[in-house]
Amino acid sequence: MALLPDKEKLLRNFLRCANWEEKYLYIIELGQRLPELRAEDRSPQNSIQGCQSQVWIVMRQNAQGIIELQGDSDAAIVKGLIAVVFILYDQMTPQDIVNFDVRPWFEKMALTQHLTPSRSQGLEAMIRAIRAKAAALS
């Protein structure tokens, strides 16, 4: 995830945006920084239900017990939201992910109040899926 900022830099960059158009463009830019997802990872088992767009999230645990996330979407803004979620969960163990509450970060960014209801539901579906997979690993 070297191409993506850490949590604090994400928040600083987001708060520097002058308006919501700039914030949306920043979110889209973050999505463009995600590594390409392999074709074989675009499978039903990695598909996230509850998203209006197609979303795939792959979760692997490395030898140190840290979760490595990869993902993609067919919608640019959703791909950016995937990147935001991955930044928040970066370098965490399964138990860290289960215990970590992303909502305060979204509140600091005022993110969910500026998303359409379907995008907010999709974001929640992504977080639920990641937390459920992490709980199964912890």
Curated annotation (Swiss-Prot):
Compartment annotation: Cytoplasm
Active site: C51
Name of the featured protein: Cysteine desulfuration protein SufE
Keyword Transcription regulation: no
Database matches in NCBIfam families: PRK09296.1 (NF006792)
GO biological process per UniProt: iron-sulfur cluster assembly; sulfur compound metabolic process
A single Gene Ontology CC term: cytoplasm
Keyword Phosphoprotein tagged: no
Keywords, comma-separated and alphabetical: Cytoplasm
Pathway where it operates: Cofactor biosynthesis; iron-sulfur cluster biosynthesis
High-level lineage: Bacteria, Pseudomonadati, Pseudomonadota, Gammaproteobacteria, Enterobacterales
Pfam families: SufE
Similarity remark: Belongs to the SufE family.
UniProt source species: Escherichia coli O139:H28 (strain E24377A / ETEC)
